[in-house]
């Protein structure tokens, strides 16, 4: 007798059949997205000056890459520029594709200039399980000042956003601009030779335009229809500055950060650090008969800093007056440049959106680390010919290790080939000495706390190990907000605040959010403060964690995690592709 429709065996068969159908449908829905990036020189004019920059496909900013959750991307990069180049896919998890992550001398050697061997490389990676706004950028020298673009990952066909569907969207890339007499590579080179800070940019940009002229010639324009709701996709591609972002007479609902959905957060100002992205809904319902400035302004977390800049774009309604000369333009009221209270209120108010079937915070912790970081002083290198050898060279460190990139082989290649002499697996779990990290007066009286040494030391992790890291900012040579980016993973932000973490934890003044913390790939650790992050090391490879203030990476404000293979083939990193760039 055949089993009834309600029997256990039939239900199991139906469930298995349904799962197979869903899996097959997901495969059908997934696509292969292909692009070719030609990197080369481009002459542009900004602020009344013609300048040669490095760009992709003759565009600044570079081309927008669009995909859907589950797609595979193949991006062939051809280097026609005079410089070594790599491309990093910022925020892409690179599951089992660490060879495509992109940081020079970490996961690959650079793509060489010219037309010979090693002058092109195809980045191959999948974006299953990711949705939202990410971006791509050069990961060599200061080239990312002009070599960058948006990477948008939409839900699978037929899958809605977990927020009200917008009528349309605008992608806004926020950047910096140098009117350099030489090139940006020379700006970094000069800083290296002197052992000091690089020259400041002269302007901020929105989609490559500074928007400083009242004639609006060099200004990005946004068109909106009254009554519609728009998804603003914001990317901070600036090299060295966090930014306040506002639109005059408009408010936002933040729905995602770093391509991770959040609970809706209502605000009139967005704070965004270099490397971070924000997705926010904006309703176009302002008063008619006006136009509205969109503004991105420097947020200075350094005490006594005076440098400020603002970029502007222009928001126009479809029904505004045709006579622009008679139209009132409204400007947003921006925070003061050092308004850390507004910054921390924004960052501290975000929580993660809980969704059925999606990962939650790992409750067990296998490894706990305390990573202190900040600026430091190191002896001048022989090649630093303009460095003051009495004073020393400006440096930076994590747990008093100033990270040095290898010169002959990438860290990932060295790890996989078990090559010796390239790096060591002994990055410390704690700083060499515990002190009152944020007491500037005490710290800067102790010269021993300012001196660091170079090293290429990484932290080895077992596959699937859960790691909790206390990121403690220090007051050595000043306090500022360092945005730290972790490659290869999203992490949960369990808590963040100002002061000395260990003093506060002893006083039981810290409460970790283990229910719905925000997820990120880049965290702006508060000036003179700390953050607690947690992630699971379920992605084999070598993954950089570094400050996304571009000047601080060559100073040494970085470290790396070397994650071992898992026990099964689907948890093991495949060999490098055939066109993997040689050193």
UniProtKB/Swiss-Prot annotation:
Residues that, per the record, bind Cu cation 3: 139, 487, 546
Domain Plastocyanin-like: 38-158, 168-320, 426-567
Localization, UniProt: Secreted, Extracellular space, Apoplast
Domain of life: Eukaryota
Enzyme Commission designation: 1.10.3.2
GO molecular function: copper ion binding; hydroquinone:oxygen oxidoreductase activity; oxidoreductase activity
UniProt keyword list: Apoplast, Copper, Glycoprotein, Lignin degradation, Metal-binding, Oxidoreductase, Repeat, Secreted, Signal
Annotated GO biological process: lignin catabolic process
Reaction(s) catalysed (UniProt annotation): 4 hydroquinone + O2 = 4 benzosemiquinone + 2 H2O
Cofactor: how and how many bound: Binds 4 Cu cations per monomer.
Main EC class the enzyme belongs to: oxidoreductase
Cofactor(s) in the UniProt record: Cu cation
Family: Belongs to the multicopper oxidase family.
PANTHER family assigned: LACCASE-7, MULTI-COPPER OXIDASE
Identification of the protein by name: Laccase-14
Source organism per UniProt: Oryza sativa subsp. japonica
Upper lineage: Eukaryota, Viridiplantae, Streptophyta, Embryophyta, Tracheophyta
């Amino acid at each position: 007798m055949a089993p009834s429709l309600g029997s256990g065996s039939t239900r199991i068969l139906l469930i298995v059949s349904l799962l197979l159908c869903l899996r097959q449908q997901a495969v059908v829905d997934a696509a292969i997205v292909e692009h070719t990036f030609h990197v080369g020189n481009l002459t542009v004019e900004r602020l009344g000056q013609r300048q040669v920059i490095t760009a992709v496909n003759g565009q600044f900013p570079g081309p927008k890459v669009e995909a859907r959750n589950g797609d595979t991307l193949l991006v062939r990069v051809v280097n026609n520029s005079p410089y070594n180049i790599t491309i990093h896919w910022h925020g892409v998890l690179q599951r089992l594709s660490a060879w495509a992550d992109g940081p020079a001398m970490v996961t690959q050697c650079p793509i060489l200039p010219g037309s010979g061997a090693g002058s092109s490389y195809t980045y191959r990676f999948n974006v299953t399980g990711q949705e939202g706004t990410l971006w791509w950028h050069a990961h060599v020298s200061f080239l990312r000042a002009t070599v960058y673009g948006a990477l948008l990952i939409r839900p699978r066909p037929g899958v809605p956003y977990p927020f009200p569907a917008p009528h349309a969207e605008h992608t806004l890339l926020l950047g910096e601009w140098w009117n350099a007499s030489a090139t940006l590579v020379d700006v970094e080179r000069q800083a290296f030779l002197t052992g000091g800070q690089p020259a400041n940019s002269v302007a901020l940009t929105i989609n490559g335009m500074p928007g400083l002229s009242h004639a609006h010639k060099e200004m990005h324009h946004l068109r909106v229809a009254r009554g519609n709701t728009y998804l603003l996709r914001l990317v901070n591609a600036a090299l060295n500055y966090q930014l306040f972002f506002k639109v005059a007479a408009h408010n936002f609902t933040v729905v995602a950060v770093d391509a991770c959905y959040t609970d809706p957060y209502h605000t009139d100002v967005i704070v965004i650090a270099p490397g971070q992205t924000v997705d926010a809904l904006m309703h176009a319902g302002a008063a008619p008969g006006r136009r509205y400035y969109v503004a991105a302004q420097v947020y200075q977390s350094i005490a006594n800093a005076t440098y400020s800049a603002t970029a502007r774009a222009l928001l126009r309604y479809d029904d505004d007056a045709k006579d622009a000369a008679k139209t009132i333009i409204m400007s947003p009221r921006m925070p003061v440049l050092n308004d850390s209270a507004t910054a921390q209120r924004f960052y501290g108010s975000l929580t993660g959106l809980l969704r059925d079937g999606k990962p939650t915070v790992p409750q067990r912790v296998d490894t706990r680390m305390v990573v202190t970081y900040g600026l430091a002083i190191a002896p001048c290198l022989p090649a630093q010919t303009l460095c003051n050898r009495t004073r020393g060279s400006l440096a930076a460190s994590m747990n008093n290790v100033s990270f040095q990139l290898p010169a002959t082989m990438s860290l990932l290649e060295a790890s996989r080939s078990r090559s010796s002499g390239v790096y060591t697996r002994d990055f410390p779990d704690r700083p060499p000495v515990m002190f009152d990290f944020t007491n500037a007066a005490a710290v800067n009286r102790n010269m021993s706390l300012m001196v660091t040494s170079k090293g290429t030391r990484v932290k080895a992790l077992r596959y699937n190990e859960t790691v909790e890291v206390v990121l403690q900012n220090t007051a050595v040579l000043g306090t500022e907000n360092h945005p730290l980016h972790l490659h290869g993973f999203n992490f949960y932000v369990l808590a963040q605040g100002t002061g000395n973490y260990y003093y506060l934890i002893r006083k039981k003044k810290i409460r970790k959010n283990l229910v719905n913390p925000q997820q990120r790939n880049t965290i702006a650790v508060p000036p003179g403060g700390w953050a607690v992050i947690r992630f699971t090391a379920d992605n084999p490879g070598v993954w950089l964690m570094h400050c996304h203030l571009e000047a601080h990476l060559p100073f040494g404000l970085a470290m790396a995690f070397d994650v071992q293979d898992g026990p099964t083939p689907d948890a093991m990193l495949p060999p490098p592709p055939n066109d993997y760039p040689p050193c």
